[in-house]
Regions:
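Amphipathic alpha-helical dimerization/coiled-coil segments
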Residues: 80-120
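Glycine-centered, phosphate/nucleic-acid-interacting loop/turn motifs that mediate DNA/RNA or nucleotide
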Residues: 55
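Short, cationic-aromatic polyanion-contact patches
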Residues: 5, 62-81
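Pre-recognition alpha-helix immediately N-terminal to the DNA-recognition helix
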Residues: 9-13
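Short acidic, hydrophobic short linear motifs in intrinsically disordered regions
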Residues: 21-30
Length: 120
């Protein structure tokens, strides 16, 4: 599975958290996020339809609107992306990936220790 873009990911985070949703509900929720740019209803509609075309969401009619529900759960998506990063950037070598992560200056000592234990 290919990675999805930032706006698609915001939509998916909402749906993973709240379950099956209408475009209207997602539009309202994303526009209510503090500091986030305001998005047109048609933008959210297009994003959700594109996610449905990619097999990430299911779209079904419900009266005059449509309900979109996840076909891919959050854990499955994250694992797929992590596997892709491991293969594409580290030749499948998990220790190289963990080694680079441990060099991240933003990590706390506790997080570094956890990475060290994971790679041991």
């Amino acid at each position: 599975m290919d990675a999805i873009g930032p706006l698609q990911l915001r939509v998916m985070h909402y749906i993973w958290k709240n379950g099956a949703s209408t475009v209207h509900a997602v539009h309202d929720a994303l526009n209510a996020e503090p500091g986030a740019p305001k998005l047109a209803y048609t933008t959210i509609l297009t994003v959700m339809r594109n996610l449905a075309k990619r097999g990430i969401l299911n779209q079904r009619p419900a009266g005059r609107s449509h309900i979109f529900e996840p076909l891919v759960d959050e854990r499955t998506y994250k694992l797929s992306i992590l596997r892709q990063v491991r293969e594409d950037l580290f030749g499948g070598d998990l220790n190289r990936l963990l080694g680079l992560l441990s060099e991240d200056a933003d990590l706390s000592q506790r997080e570094r220790d956890a990475l060290g234990q994971a790679s041991a």
